[in-house]
């Protein structure tokens, strides 16, 4: 009975060890974004495996919306690595001779989209074997900033904050005091591993240099801050100064506006006065006045004559003297007045008057 059991065990071991097998165990791999992930896949062949060697790596993305995709393939002594666009140029076999039993690959410049399940499949008829590896890509903490939220005055309440710009969860925080006794204040001990420390009733003993370290499974980052707890400032003086400054600014603005308004009024007044002043222009000279003077003197002479002697004068016609702006109108020929003897004129009370001669065109000579 014992011999039969040993025979069965030996047969099982022989069957288990025969044929193609992948010796690398399945495992979970965690790497940081931007790093290189090494996915191992080592295999052994048996004499019975006589067919062509085919090696392929497949990926099942973490979103589970895409079926398994081939990312790199070895077949017919050739390598094909352009099947999966997201990993094109970033996946390579680590061995120059994969037939030696090493089908491991490197995935460079890891991105969050590379997260998923990778499968190594080796085929050499009649043997077939495969192993799966879970790749997780994490982001290192970076860009961490330490700052004080509040007024750093004695008796005040404020907060010390430690905030990384990026980093995959879970994140761990640790505060330390780097100056003086390097001992954290007792009220803060409960929050030494928190991203925020709440400071109550601050005292000058809290002043010093502090550091905050944040880390996750793939990396860490650190920031520092200087805390200076000072006596309260003179708020009344500050408020009074602000009020006085505001009033002075308002007065200055008012003065500027007043000056601008006054200047505009002066300019407007000067402009109106300038438009109201007109220079008197003398009227154009006319020859009509000369003619009128002659006619007036002639009428005076005729007024001293008797009605019987004015018969010749009543028929005399004078044409109107045109202005310089118009052409002179043609004149009708004038009749010579009747002659009266000098003794008759004297008896009539006439006074001798010199009458200027008149040309045919009406002008006085």
UniProtKB/Swiss-Prot annotation:
Assembly and interactions?
Monomer. May form homodimer. Interacts with LNX, MAGI1, DLG4, PRKCABP, TJP1 and CTNNB1. Interacts with MPDZ; recruits MPDZ to intercellular contact sites. Interacts with JAML (homodimeric form).
**GO MF term list:** beta-catenin binding; cell adhesion molecule binding; cell adhesive protein binding involved in AV node cell-bundle of His cell communication; connexin binding; PDZ domain binding
**Sequence ranges on the Cytoplasmic membrane side:** 259-365
Record's GO cellular component terms: acrosomal vesicle; adherens junction; apicolateral plasma membrane; basolateral plasma membrane; bicellular tight junction; cell body; cell-cell junction; cytoplasm
Q: Sorted alphabetically, which Pfam families does this protein's record hold?
A: Ig_2, V-set
Any single GO BP term = AV node cell-bundle of His cell adhesion involved in cell communication
Give the record's PTM text: Palmitoylated on Cys-259 and/or Cys-260; required for proper localization to the plasma membrane.
Name of the protein this chain belongs to: Coxsackievirus and adenovirus receptor homolog
Residue ranges of domain Ig-like C2-type in the record: 20-136, 141-228
Q: Which UniProt keywords apply?
A: Cell adhesion, Cell junction, Cell membrane, Disulfide bond, Glycoprotein, Immunoglobulin domain, Lipoprotein, Membrane, Palmitate, Phosphoprotein, Receptor, Repeat, Secreted, Signal, Tight junction, Transmembrane, Transmembrane helix
Q: Where are the transmembrane segments?
A: 238-258
